[in-house]
Swiss-Prot record:
Record keyword Ribosomal protein present: no
TM ranges: 7-26
Membrane topology (Lumenal): 1-6
Cytoplasmic side: 27-68
Family annotation (InterPro entries): TGBp3 (IPR003411)
Further details from the record: TGBp1, TGBp2 and TGBp3 seem to act together for cell-to-cell propagation. TGBp1 is the main movement protein that physically cross the plasmodesma with the viral genome. TGBp2 and TGBp3 would facilitate TGBp1 function.
Function: Plays a role in viral cell-to-cell propagation, by facilitating genome transport to neighboring plant cells through plasmosdesmata. May induce the formation of granular vesicles derived from the Endoplasmic reticulum, which align on actin filaments.
One annotated GO biological process: transport of virus in host, cell to cell
Source organism of this protein record: Papaya mosaic potexvirus (PMV)
Protein known as: Movement protein TGBp3
Length: 68
């Protein structure tokens, strides 16, 4: 099964992710958020003008690599 360290690490990672998501939803988009869905990307927030298509493609490739 899983060791105590693995369970603790999973629980802490989940807690930190929930805290970050709560913080991001509480602030009114102070930064540019990229939502990658399928073959498209939606940019929301401020300072999105500085992002290039290469940056979005790199993020998409990184996430695709994490899924595999």
């Amino acid at each position: 099964m899983f060791s105590g360290k693995e369970i603790t690490l999973f629980a802490l990672s989940t807690l930190i992710a929930l805290i970050v998501l709560n913080y991001m939803s509480a602030t009114p988009n102070p930064v540019c958020l990229i939502e990658l869905t399928g073959h498209s990307a939606v940019l929301r927030g401020n300072n999105c003008e500085s992002l290039t298509s290469g940056v979005i493609e790199a993020l998409s490739a990184h996430l695709h690599g994490l899924r595999n």
